[in-house]
Amino acid sequence: MAAQGFLLIASFLLLLFLLARPLGNVLARMINGVPLPLVGGVENGVWRVLGIQNQEMNWRQYLLAILLLNVFGLFVLFAMLMLQGILPLNPQQLPGLSWHLALNTAVSFVSNTNWQSYAGETTLSYFSQMVGLTVQNFLSAASGIAVIFALTRAFARQKVNTLGNAWVDLTRITLWVLLPISLVIALFFIQQGTLQNLLPYASYTSLEGVKQMLPMGPVASQEAIKMLGTNGGGFFNANSSHPFENPTALTNFVQMLAIFLIPAALCFAFGDVVNDRRQGRTLLWAMSLIFVVCAALVMWAEWHGNAHFMQLGVDSNINMEGKESRFGILASSLYAVVTTAASCGAVNAMHDSFTALGGMIPLWLMQIGEVVFGGVGSGLYGMLLFVLLAVFIAGLMIGRTPEYLGKKIDVREMKLTALAILVTPALVLMGTALALMTDAGRSGIFNPGIHGFSEVLYAVSSAANNNGSAFAGLSANSPFWNCLLAFCMFVGRFGVIVPVMAIAGSLVSKNIQPTSSGTLPTHGALFVGLLIGTVLLVGALTFIPALALGPVAEHLSLR
């Protein structure tokens, strides 16, 4: 097991870095405003049609543009889901959604969470899937990348107050990054057997003689951006464990690569833009080390079997419950870590069926803020918040004003950093408490006791951190749960983006100080250790009590 697991992780990271490096070069050019070859005419035509003027924006204007796009998309998607029954491309004649489910779904896809309180094949029409959800998969991913573009420029520029043009960035990200790569991935998925059609559901007779319906649909086109944009919402209820979404071991591996591709490339781009590639590599090393340790722990936990079965005298050397045999223990474990380290939430196995410790690692990866590679854009700006916190702590220890990349980190930046870091823990802990204190919240719990608490904690953690995966075991399609999780998803997304943009606006106007003998090096092994320690410290102090009541207590109760 150890050799196979090591080979799988090593080959995954090697291919990831080989693909991410050239993409990082492209992203760096876009951040610096260097036109890509042969695309200037297309860009100018799109901007003329959309009425976009290529003028620089300050942080408030940039933030307002991002918020306007997402709020407008929220209302459009909400209306589309409510009116689904009268819209085209609905061969199964599926009705419109209830108001609370439509609200939850709209917020979910606009916020890049893709939490699903429904089964896609029995709830949504092809029109809703293609024009509603797939479009938001592109726009939410582009929004996250645009925010990190602005923050990266804030570190690279000095004595100005502009961060680029949000509409220009969104257009370029969508046209030259998300669309072309998604097209290539979608064609590969189709070649491997993923569905892509607009046919009505097919009727067939099973071996038992029962007539059933075989779902159809434009799956591959949504599956590609679902992975590349770290969205995660599946066309089918079984998500990427469904053979129509993820038919082979090769598509499974490509899906994992697609999830991490842009987050890793952004680290390379960050180093290029700030003219110090060591900075990008430092962030990548910190993310990779945490990722490797977590992946190894989940593989180890799942390989040692299910204690529930052992107590019943059932031979259970490995825990295959809830896993697809075509993927097995190692690929399922790695997928679980990838999808929760990033804010993706796609699943190829049932996380609720993992062992107590095997399920705790994905839960904890979400709770630390999705900063281990993380979502497209959101992962890097989340990690940079921890970088600012780390240099602040180091500055206190050595008695110097904290600096990062020559920019002094003052009281304003630290207040905003603290606010951004504390938004999601507050949502998780208070949301979990509210769900457990109210009858409406407890009525959705199917599994009472320790594991039921873990399921509630996982659901709220997933929503607040914009992941979207679930432990299941909850009846989440109710007014209480749909509204609670919608609130957590919206505030968890934009409650972090607002202070991040404010930090960018503050930093971009500052002068870049020359490096001196007293400057703390923010690259190399020492700073990697300091950064990882900061992430672990904040995560441990915040969530250890809650984890002790859930997965830890469940693990100890089985020994």
UniProtKB/Swiss-Prot annotation:
Subcellular compartments: Cell inner membrane
Coiled coil: none
Subunit and interaction comment: The system is composed of three essential subunits: KdpA, KdpB and KdpC.
Endpoints of the signal sequence: none
GO molecular function: P-type potassium transmembrane transporter activity; potassium ion binding
Membrane topology: Multi-pass membrane protein
Keywords, sorted A to Z: Cell inner membrane, Cell membrane, Ion transport, Membrane, Potassium, Potassium transport, Transmembrane, Transmembrane helix, Transport
Family to which this protein belongs: Belongs to the KdpA family.
A GO CC term assigned to this protein in UniProt: plasma membrane
Protein name: Potassium-transporting ATPase potassium-binding subunit
Classification via Pfam families: KdpA (PF03814)
Bilayer-crossing regions: 6-26, 63-83, 131-151, 173-193, 253-273, 283-303, 327-347, 356-376, 379-399, 416-436, 484-504, 524-544
Record flagged with keyword Ion transport: yes
Function: Part of the high-affinity ATP-driven potassium transport (or Kdp) system, which catalyzes the hydrolysis of ATP coupled with the electrogenic transport of potassium into the cytoplasm. This subunit binds the periplasmic potassium ions and delivers the ions to the membrane domain of KdpB through an intramembrane tunnel.
